[in-house]
């Protein structure tokens, strides 16, 4: 049964699982019902639209007038060459925002991404195919590679490049896929809390974790506009929420301590159901429990110390009264 509260439960757990070099899972929980999708959906959108990447924005090919032209000695027409070119994923090495790169190939040759690697740029999908030229052909082209976010259509790029260049649709985002699942998770015997499982796949320009961090930063920056008028004390709000949940372990059942049957039965008979009840006790009170022997006493003391609540130390600080009240509510 869910209790009435005055603030939403703050998630306390996060896991990052690197599935492979370009795939990662970010798992966070527990969230109040409805909060998980409220956060996951915009984060997914921001992963696609705000993550910085690189893309070819224009190409100039010797002997070619426009994108519907053909080139003697090349298997592909110019349209197919451009499609293959846009499938290559570039990464500038020198933190530059824009580079013009010159290429020259003599046939016979099958050209793939690895052939475009040089001191300026790296192709992160080096096996991707570009073109084939025969023994009589020579392929020379200039390529503009830029740094950006999201998608920019060729019509907009055409406005600022030289007329001899062919403008390209620029797909900057390095995020190939971002999907999330919302799962239920149990908190304080309530199964209605939620877990976000976000899977991020990138093309290799950046790692999935870098992309995720960038989306979080973008969300913070976009939300900060409201603070210009409302003057929200974000640090105070976070501190308040963290204080309310920092001892959440104490609201778990003593069953989670994995005590021996003798020790657990002794606590059960004393109606001690929550870990927090042990944390609130003095060692002398624990010793006075009926039928609690020295072996069980030592076991409970060791387990409580292991989870950060040793007897004889004031680990709860000013949280004691709030914890007593919460446990009383749970047991009522």
Swiss-Prot record:
InterPro entries, per database record: DNA-dir_RNA_pol_insert, DNA-dir_RNA_pol_RpoA/D/Rpb3, DNA-dir_RpoA, RBP11-like, RNAP_asu_C, RNApol_insert_sf
EC number in record: 2.7.7.6
Keyword Acyltransferase annotated: no
Catalytic activity: RNA(n) + a ribonucleoside 5'-triphosphate = RNA(n+1) + diphosphate
Gene3D superfamilies documented for this protein: 5' to 3' exonuclease, C-terminal subdomain, DNA-directed RNA polymerase, insert domain, RNA polymerase, RBP11-like subunit
A single cellular component GO annotation: cytoplasm
Entry keyword set: DNA-directed RNA polymerase, Nucleotidyltransferase, Transcription, Transferase
Location of the region described as Alpha N-terminal domain (alpha-NTD) in the Swiss-Prot/TrEMBL record: 1-230
GO MF, any single term: protein dimerization activity
Ranges for region Alpha C-terminal domain (alpha-CTD): 246-332
Residues in coiled coil: none
BP GO annotations: DNA-templated transcription
Subunit structure: Homodimer. The RNAP catalytic core consists of 2 alpha, 1 beta, 1 beta' and 1 omega subunit. When a sigma factor is associated with the core the holoenzyme is formed, which can initiate transcription.
Similarity annotation: Belongs to the RNA polymerase alpha chain family.
Domain comment quoted from the record: The N-terminal domain is essential for RNAP assembly and basal transcription, whereas the C-terminal domain is involved in interaction with transcriptional regulators and with upstream promoter elements.
Protein function: DNA-dependent RNA polymerase catalyzes the transcription of DNA into RNA using the four ribonucleoside triphosphates as substrates.
Protein's name in the database: DNA-directed RNA polymerase subunit alpha
Provenance organism: Campylobacter fetus subsp. fetus (strain 82-40)
Organism lineage string: Bacteria, Pseudomonadati, Campylobacterota, Epsilonproteobacteria, Campylobacterales
